[in-house]
Amino acid sequence: MALSAAIILAAGEGTRMRSNKPKVLHTLAGKTFLNRVMDSVAALDPDTLAVVVHYQAERVAEAARSYNEHVTIVEQDDIPGTGRAVQCAMAQLTQKDDLDGAVLIAASDMPLLDTDTLDQLLAFHEKSGNGATVLTTILDDPTGYGRIIRDSEGNVLRIVEQKDANSSELAVREVNTSVYVFDAKLLAEAIANLKSNNAQGEFYLTDALEAAKANGAVGAFAAPDPLSVEGVNDRVQLAALAKAHNKRVCEHWMREGVTILDPDTTWIEDDVQIARDAVILPGCFLQGHTVIGEAAEVGPYTTLIGATIDAEAHVERSRVQETHIGRAANIGPWTYLRPGNELGEGSKAGAFVEMKKAHIGNGTKVPHLSYVGDADLGEHTNIGGGTITANYDGVHKHHTTIGSNVHVGAGNLFVAPVTVGDGVTTGAGSVVRHDVPSDSMVYSENTQHVVEGWKPEWER
């Protein structure tokens, strides 16, 4: 059905989160609550997507705009309540257009709200011919939620907020999810005369349903998946919801042919892609747009952030950010790959190696205790332990180039900018300050001095 507008309510503080940032900017599986709801709603292709802000308004508005530049920002005034939020939104939206069709309203603190559930809600609303439809769910513990009160025939009479409910109403387990569909014109009429005569002194959007009943049927659609409409009020709820969601994500990948040895300690964000026969060992965090190839092995205790791991590569006990690791490469343990690296097929970055903006050729090995930054290394080169590319002069970063088939001795220091040609051998402890031609050897003249019988001053 035609969706004239979608209004996302993001004005609240979320005091129970006990946070210095608005609740809607907290994250689940790598995305803020607000962005997750915006994704689901935008997929419905509304004519207008609006976000209502108030607490830390500019911060929330900027987060919304940076995620979707086409969003309309509505600032709620100091009059509290969800009803007032929708009044402000409708006043702004109807200044531009005469809304004609359906208006979807959704809270922004349901991070798992999905497009499929919203599609079903819209279809039910249209098929039923309702003037307004509320999305509901059944909870074992409905504490904190508005209760759906029906008559003996199952028709929706009203929604009663927790603080305004009597004992019989508190026993109701069907609750309001704070997602609604209204006929646009009916909504405009229903919110025009909202009053704040309730325990909270707020303008409740739920009161608009009672007003709407005079001009059109009010229905309720129960969400098929309660998890999709579960709200977050505090960090305890957030942790529980994140765990439940992550369990589903892990189960999805296991059914796709991925081995996850311990789903309870493996965390996988939504944008991660994993090929079949990959193996994920315990204690792994897979984040951002990470891609893991066929038969690759990750872990244990590894964090991948926006990394690409090609087939048959092995990454153990390491942190990898925005790095491409080639086929059958071997990373770790305790390797730190910062953004911008490209490691070739069969390459190695071993224990206590750090890399940044390094291009490592096929078969090249940096086995241990080294820093390689702003550098190009050719193919089948071996870097001795304790080697450093000194790339920073205090103001600018400089580049190091080391060719193919180079043997670098232990404890070398390359003072960039410097280029070492193909087939070079460097002596242990060398400090390489100047370019080295191909097929040569370079070493530093470090004279060893021995002082016999020497003792420190305090022992003399």
Curated annotation (Swiss-Prot):
GO terms for molecular function: glucosamine-1-phosphate N-acetyltransferase activity; magnesium ion binding; UDP-N-acetylglucosamine diphosphorylase activity. Its cofactor is Mg(2+). Keywords: Acyltransferase, Cell shape, Cell wall biogenesis/degradation, Cytoplasm, Magnesium, Metal-binding, Multifunctional enzyme, Nucleotidyltransferase, Peptidoglycan synthesis, Repeat, Transferase. It comes from the Bacteria. Residues 1-235 are annotated as: Pyrophosphorylase. Homotrimer. This is Bifunctional protein GlmU. The lineage of its organism: Bacteria, Bacillati, Actinomycetota, Actinomycetes, Bifidobacteriales. The gene is glmU.
